[in-house]
Amino acid sequence: MSELLSFALFLASVLIYAWKAGRNTWWFAATLTVLGLFVVLNITLFASDYFTGDGINDAVLYTLTNSLTGAGVSKYILPGIGIVLGLTAVFGALGWILRRRRHHPHHFGYSLLALLLALGSVDASPAFRQITELVKSQSRDGDPDFAAYYKEPSKTIPDPKLNLVYIYGESLERTYFDNEAFPDLTPELGALKNEGLDFSHTQQLPGTDYTIAGMVASQCGIPLFAPFEGNASASVSSFFPQNICLGDILKNSGYQNYFVQGANLRFAGKDVFLKSHGFDHLYGSEELKSVVADPHYRNDWGFYDDTVLDEAWKKFEELSRSGQRFSLFTLTVDTHHPDGFISRTCNRKKYDFDGKPNQSFSAVSCSQENIATFINKIKASPWFKDTVIVVSSDHLAMNNTAWKYLNKQDRNNLFFVIRGDKPQQETLAVKRNTMDNGATVLDILGGDNYLGLGRSSLSGQSMSEIFLNIKEKTLAWKPDIIRLWKFPKEMKEFTIDQQKNMIAFSGSHFRLPLLLRVSDKRVEPLPESEYSAPLRFQLADFAPRDNFVWVDRCYKMAQLWAPELALSTDWCVSQGQLGGQQIVQHVDKTTWKGKTAFKDTVIDMARYKGNVDTLKIVDNDIRYKADSFIFNVAGAPEEVKQFSGISRPESWGRWSNAQLGDEVKIEYKHPLPKKFDLVITAKAYGNNASRPIPVRVGNEEQTLVLGNEVTTTTLHFDNPTDADTLVIVPPEPVSTNEGNILGHSPRKLGIGMVEIKVVEREG
């Protein structure tokens, strides 16, 4: 209803101003600005729904102030360009319409009415309401009743008798199991769901809507609200350190806790969270690659579900035979947005919907088959009678190719329990949320029936039942939950440990690199993660007077304040204010101690603008003083005009990447010498080793041969045509995820470059 009212007010404002208001520059500018704001808000809402499937939420707020990177980002580039072009066209059309009667005299009454209607359209829009609520959630002090509802359970389970298998299905929401909406999509796992305790109304709340957040909510009974973006949790050294979570209780009760997944454990800080709360045995892509049958059988995120669940079954057998009480948690990945992945062993590789194949539905059908196979192995084993199996989604599906069909249904998370000790078949339609999952499991295992804000759905009352406005209530508790992190409020001294790549201050520890905004009463950590912008881009968003401490590789800050460190990959510390003074210190000891030294100086806006502009220079446009191209730092020597076909810097150098160009091409600002030696320090990847690699300058071509280890080769060139471009053509680029950023599409690697130097020859 509010959408229609908002649009009606918008349309009325446009018509009244266009036909009645007449000519006046101020009223035209004011009305166009407000109407333009209406357009921007609604396009933001549309775009947010496209990315998150949940309107304008915390994730959108973070994305708007940082960058969108991660899995499948290329899928969103065209829609993003379309939105920008559409926005430009709408603004142009809006301005043209409003100025149609610019030759008529100005009418104050109609101008005022049009402006008021425009303001009303903004106020009535759902986008404005969502943003207002989001901003309020960032600035509240908390809710006084939080302590009354947040309850810590007993730290142990008296006389535990059951082992636990807990399966997180990536984005595998209960909506997929509606056989009327999606016929025969989930027959195997759906049949198992119908044999157990099926909780049919598990809603998703703020702070529980992505993987690590869903895990925290289900194991600790709280949403993942933090003084930083949740997926950047890999930078912290402990995770809600004061909270009692399900893993803590299991460990205290004699359980050995195991976690198995196909992706890298470091992503989003899953390793930190699990280690902080009772899990001593963790297996991710790095740990599994030496034990799986085929270490090359991987998707963009890691190992496929069939591989992961096979390893989980082996671990279940091993632990069951040992007689040791255990919990085994596993997380699938094949149903990750935007398209999902199809394991090669499943029978259900294709699912048609609306008369055509749908990749996301196909991935769901395949993954549920793999999960069902794993569960049926457990059920057929002699140890099932001592086991509780839990299957849940980590969160609702995000914007995938099935999303528009899911949105037509009543969407809920998946949560069902199969008890080997006491089979029960029942569908429970009680209102609940993800935070109730851990408390329900704890209750089944013989522990308390509450865990944080979670309550057992078998013997307690969920917050979703107590509060009709549970989403708003959850956001009201956000400051209280953030305080559970026990983050420091001041930073005066700090220590950097180079061996551990950590910084410590006021009792807190963080992984490097790290950016901190420091005020009188708050220290705000801004870690770098797969989903965040580089720290220098985050720093560029600081106000002129914001105090900062930035710990990063020296070359990243050298172009601003320490050009002598432009080629250093050591750690450096910079601090100060973007509009004031800044200092850079080289971390030259294994354990390095520093102090904050912020000065209350006069703010220079010209300096501030210059710093911000420099911070925002993209990597490939950075230039440094050097007589060679050093590939383990960002940018290129000053003599280089542009380059292509080269991947990002890594600690040793850079790979060529055929996804960015079939050739490595380095164009210099001036012609290369008439006679020169090209000194190349490099290595080859895969089948490119021991193969002739063409290297061209103008019409002359030489051959480079590399092995899998780094070597230095000198090639002799004559350049009579004054060519200014060096071209290297890897013969057989290999598609691989080796060394790739988690969730990104595979790179096509050819040669790995450490240094390229042009040395002029006499004569």
Swiss-Prot record:
UniProt membrane topology term: Multi-pass membrane protein
Protein's name according to its UniProt entry: Phosphoglycerol transferase I
Transmembrane segments: 1-21, 26-46, 77-97, 108-128
PANTHER family: LIPOTEICHOIC ACID SYNTHASE (PTHR47371), PHOSPHOGLYCEROL TRANSFERASE I (PTHR47371:SF3)
Localization per record: Cell inner membrane
Family label: Belongs to the OpgB family.
InterPro entries documented for this protein: Alkaline_phosphatase_core_sf, DUF7024, OpgB, OpgB/LTA_synthase_biosynth, Sulfatase_N
GO biological process assignments: glucan biosynthetic process
UniProtKB keywords: Cell inner membrane, Cell membrane, Membrane, Transferase, Transmembrane, Transmembrane helix
MF annotations from Gene Ontology: phosphatidylglycerol-membrane-oligosaccharide glycerophosphotransferase activity
Pfam families given in the database record: DUF7024, Sulfatase
Upper classification of the organism: Bacteria, Pseudomonadati, Pseudomonadota, Gammaproteobacteria, Enterobacterales
Main location per the UniProt record: membrane
EC code: 2.7.8.20
Pathways involved: Glycan metabolism; osmoregulated periplasmic glucan (OPG) biosynthesis
Catalysed reactions, as listed in the record: a phosphatidylglycerol + a membrane-derived-oligosaccharide D-glucose = a 1,2-diacyl-sn-glycerol + a membrane-derived-oligosaccharide 6-(glycerophospho)-D-glucose
Species of the source: Escherichia coli O17:K52:H18 (strain UMN026 / ExPEC)
Cellular component, GO annotation: plasma membrane
Gene: mdoB
Function: Transfers a phosphoglycerol residue from phosphatidylglycerol to the membrane-bound nascent glucan backbones.
